[in-house]
Amino acid sequence: MTLLARLDRLPLSRPHYLLLLIGGLGYTFDGMDSAVVAFLLPSAQEEWGLSNGQLGFIGSATPFGFLFGATIAGLLGDRIGRKKVMMYALAFYAVFSVIAAFAPNYEVFLVARVLAGAGAGAESAIIAPFLSEFVPAKRRGWFIGALAGFFSFGFVMAALIGRFVVPTFDDGWRIAQVITALPILMLLWWRRSLPESPRFLLQQGRADEAEQVVADLERRVEKATGQPLPPVPETAVAPTTSAPKVNLISALRFLWSPAMAKRTAVIWLIWFVITFSYYGFFSWIPTLLVQRGITVTKSFEFSIIIYLAQIPGYFSAAWLSERMDRKNTIALYLAGSAVSAFWLSQMDSPVTITVAGAVLSFFLNGTYAGVYSYTPEVFPTWIRATGTGLSSAFGRVGSILAPTIIGLSAASLGFAGVFGLTTAVLVAGVVCVIVFGLATAGRSLEELTETTEEATR
């Protein structure tokens, strides 16, 4: 009987859903921060007289910070623990969000957005691998997909802020920026309610602490369900109780070793494809709607409709990922995204753009639900946070490039050309997943990574 077998046999119940809520709120505010910038751009442009190129740099600031934050969070998460990184990242993000709100000029605002993005990126990269280590294999796809679904609530909140706060007050865009710092209020709750990952504790040789976490979770699950716990199954794969020290060089060496190179290449490409397409679309959709002849306020209303389509996208993909595997779910939703992006490229009225944009929003965000479930599953525990962080960081290269590329090329390519480019990127992702993706549904984290452990010995 192993500690992790005891953990994996627990039925999902109130203690798991509390973890889902805690992590989900983190993703809600990450999503809000990522999306709100699109609604700040017109006001910032008017106040500081910014060019389209400068607006593109602001749009790229948060994902640029995400890149560094995700990389650092992964490395630290495998060294000092997932919980500490989550809390430090949240505080860092909130401080620089407030600084951005009171920025006196473009330069200070840009730097503050980059640093706030680093905090948000660190938090975002660590939540999914952290919580995936608490969830039984048979429900992990749904759980992490639903966790990622909280991003959609943040985007809807951003759209509502853009519609009702930004145009209502003289400094509405600054007030909106202050609102993004509110998650600082969650710190005390997180400190009291979040346990450290027992898988991380075992890897660090802290078996007594891991036992305490699992025993406490067992007690709470039994109390919540009012039933005896299921029997502990025999396990074929034992967890390792020691691991190499992780730094950036050793991590990259392992991730691109023969045992891991295929997995790493597929995951990194998927992250690049989805973030390039996602940020290229959502960073510019209000501005593109304005350029199609509607008012800024009306463009924000259309954006709310588009953002609302994210919610069923996330949760439908979370449901499907347990039934047709993460790999197939990602391929299906990427294909839907490609078709939707092409459809959007052919539209020329605000209403048809909004409808096509809502469908694209549904499929893009469904893809994200699959990706957030899939990524932590392919890396061993000792490097799970680092692997997830580096994958997310590489994806942020796409999100950095997309707003700037679209901002600079929209004049020459036009509306159709911009989304034609997005279609081509998405098609490449579909082919990659279908041909090279790994099936993961219903398998324990230790089983999925058993063969890769040989590369560390």
Located regions from the model:
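Transmembrane-helix signature of 12-pass secondary carriers
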Residues: 1-457
